[in-house]
Amino acid sequence: MHFCHIVGWGLVLAVLYLRTEAKPVAQAHQKSLRALLGEELAEYLVSGERGERSIDPKTRARLLRDIRADTRSRAAWTRLLNEHPNSRKIKGINKKGTSKGCFGLKLDRIGAMSGLGC
């Protein structure tokens, strides 16, 4: 039984190894990727293949600016949609304000309800 498990796991590892070998991307896939990314981002793809950085600095600055603006807008939407922006403060106040007595009931005086005290 143990031998079968070892052989089975060996086959699984062999299949995973063969599956993860690096293979070059076909030209058809690369063209469709370039079409999806657009001209500006396709330049990054091409420069990454050659190992060079031949992208215009103005284009790079504009792309980085667009990315930063997107991050800011996401943060604004998060703040806008957040129902309780100060939820930590509210939880802290409520926790102190609704403290329970010794037996699960809030007491005005020690031992007022049970006569035992805490």
Swiss-Prot record:
Protein name (Swiss-Prot/TrEMBL): C-type natriuretic peptide 2
GO annotation, biological process: blood vessel diameter maintenance; cGMP biosynthetic process; receptor guanylyl cyclase signaling pathway
Predominant location: secreted
Phosphoprotein in keyword set: no
Signal sequence coordinates: 1-22
Transmembrane segments: none
Family: Belongs to the natriuretic peptide family.
Pfam families: ANP
Its biological purpose: Exhibits natriuretic and vasodepressor activity. Has a cGMP-stimulating activity.
Superkingdom classification of source: Eukaryota
One GO MF term attached to the UniProt entry: hormone activity
Entry keyword set: Cleavage on pair of basic residues, Disulfide bond, Hormone, Secreted, Signal, Vasoactive
Propeptide: 23-96
SMART domains in the record: NAT_PEP
Disulfide bonds, paired cysteine numbers: 102-118
Originating organism: Aquarana catesbeiana (American bullfrog)
Keyword Disulfide bond: yes
GO cellular component: extracellular region
Subcellular location field: Secreted
